[in-house]
């Protein structure tokens, strides 16, 4: 049995909040560089170049990649042979608070969605998953709301065809347009219940971009990416063939009477950081 203290979790979450907001993921940066080399639209190419330059400046100067430092979503994988000493939830929330203060990251979270009020920095969305082993993995995804606001869920009939599902996903990207700061990473969740499909769509954003995953979804992801990049939305909505960097699909078994499909879009600043303890 491996023992992990709440203090260790707190400090790790704090560091991950800072890293995620200041250092763009290598796979995202690689995808942006690749898109820059392939883009033929002059204005789109200039915008992609500016996005890449911004990422380098953020890392060098220890500044946030984007002024919207997001709502921290923390995914926790807890090994069955791990014992946590202390309050896990309190440790995560304190880690978020410390990370946002130490990293000089904007406070964006309000405690009451109806009354609004002054933003705070000690709140997060926490997802727990129990796995085999004696490791604890923490993944922090700061989700900006320019793109989060474009999330959509559709409860298809179980008789729905693949083309109908593709049409829905593409329509979500179209409606997001320039507001969600393309080029996008498109996360798709299919199956489960309504809430679980939305969870899967967000979790898909943690996947390494354009990795060769030999799954049944691979051809669908590839086809969707090609169709999305024909929309001519382009970087920041000003045209070009780089509307999305990747499409990632996560699936889960569902009820015979339903077919939930959710789409969660990330802007070009797809930020996340993870660590095993």
Model regions: which residues?
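Non-transmembrane, aqueous-exposed alpha-helical and coiled segments at domain scale
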Residues: 1-188, 193-277
């Amino acid at each position: 049995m491996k023992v992990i203290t709440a203090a260790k979790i707190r400090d790790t979450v704090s560091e991950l909040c800072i890293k995620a907001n200041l250092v763009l993921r290598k796979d995202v940066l690689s995808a942006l560089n690749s898109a820059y080399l392939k883009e033929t639209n002059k204005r789109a190419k200039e915008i992609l170049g500016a996005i890449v330059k911004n990422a380098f400046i953020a890392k060098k100067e220890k500044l946030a990649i984007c002024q919207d430092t997001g709502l921290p979503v923390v995914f926790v994988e807890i090994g069955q042979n791990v014992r946590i000493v202390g309050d896990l939830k309190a440790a995560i929330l304190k880690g978020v608070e410390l990370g946002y203060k130490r990293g000089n990251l904007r406070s964006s979270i309000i405690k009451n969605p109806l009354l609004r009020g002054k933003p705070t920095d000690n709140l997060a969305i926490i997802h727990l998953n129990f796995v085999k082993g004696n490791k604890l993995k923490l993944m922090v995804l700061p989700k900006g709301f320019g793109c989060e606001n474009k999330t959509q869920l559709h409860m298809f009939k179980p008789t729905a065809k693949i083309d109908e599902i593709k049409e829905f996903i593409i329509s979500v990207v179209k409606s997001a347009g320039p507001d969600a700061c393309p080029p996008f990473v498109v996360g798709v969740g299919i199956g489960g219940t309504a809430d679980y499909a939305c969870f899967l769509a967000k979790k898909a954003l943690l996947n390494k971009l354009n990795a060769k995953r030999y799954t049944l979804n691979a051809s669908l992801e590839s086809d969707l990416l090609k169709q999305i990049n024909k929309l001519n939305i382009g970087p920041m909505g000003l045209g070009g063939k780089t509307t999305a960097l990747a499409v990632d699909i996560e699936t889960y078994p569902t009820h015979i009477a339903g077919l939930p499909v959710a789409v969660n879009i990330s802007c070009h600043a797809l930020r996340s950081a993870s660590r095993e303890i």
